[in-house]
């Protein structure tokens, strides 16, 4: 028989830097999960990708065991990294804060493809371009 799921927790954590401090500790502690065990496993899996941010979906079972699944880094994080900027524009329609090329958009779309609800690479690229536009990042040829 399958284990009974009591919670699904979503966190965005930097690779190799999960610690029992907030936000990890309180989120997992209230469900009785061994926080250090999660931190060690997460850090081991993401150790080879320093500086990246990963969304993790942690499934907590009734016996206090857990499994976690890593998603691809957020599109906004990948766009900021590609454009070489710290944060997006406060007024994206008026103030442009950076530029990325179509090739960079395609690269980001390839990375994000498993998590996007797009069937083709072109559709995924349009999603990424829209995200970039909403952040005040210009897409150039």
Swiss-Prot record:
Protein's name in the database: Large ribosomal subunit protein uL11
Keyword vocabulary terms for this entry: Methylation, Ribonucleoprotein, Ribosomal protein, RNA-binding, rRNA-binding
Residue pairs linked by disulfide bridges in the UniProt entry: none
Family the entry assigns: Belongs to the universal ribosomal protein uL11 family.
Alphabetized GO MF terms: large ribosomal subunit rRNA binding; structural constituent of ribosome
Gene Ontology terms describing biological process: translation
Domain of life, source organism: Bacteria
Pfam families per UniProt: Ribosomal_L11, Ribosomal_L11_N
Record PTM: One or more lysine residues are methylated.
GO cellular component, one term: cytosolic large ribosomal subunit
Gene3D superfamilies the record matches: Ribosomal protein L11, C-terminal domain, Ribosomal protein L11/L12, N-terminal domain
Role of this protein: Forms part of the ribosomal stalk which helps the ribosome interact with GTP-bound translation factors.
Subunit structure of this chain's protein: Part of the ribosomal stalk of the 50S ribosomal subunit. Interacts with L10 and the large rRNA to form the base of the stalk. L10 forms an elongated spine to which L12 dimers bind in a sequential fashion forming a multimeric L10(L12)X complex.
């Amino acid at each position: 028989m399958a284990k009974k799921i009591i919670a699904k927790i979503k966190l965005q954590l930097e690779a190799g830097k999960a610690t029992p401090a907030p936000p990890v500790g309180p989120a997992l502690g209230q469900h009785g999960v061994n926080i250090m065990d999660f931190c060690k496993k997460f850090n081991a899996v993401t150790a080879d990708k320093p500086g990246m941010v990963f969304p993790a979906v942690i499934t907590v079972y009734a016996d206090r065991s857990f499994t976690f699944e890593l998603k691809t880094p957020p599109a906004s994080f990948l766009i900021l990294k590609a454009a070489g900027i710290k944060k997006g524009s406060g007024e994206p329609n008026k103030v442009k804060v950076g530029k990325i090329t179509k090739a960079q958009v395609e690269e980001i779309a390839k990375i994000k493809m498993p998590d996007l609800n797009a069937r083709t690479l072109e559709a995924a690229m349009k999603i990424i371009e829209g995200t970039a536009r909403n952040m005040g990042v210009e897409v150039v040829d």
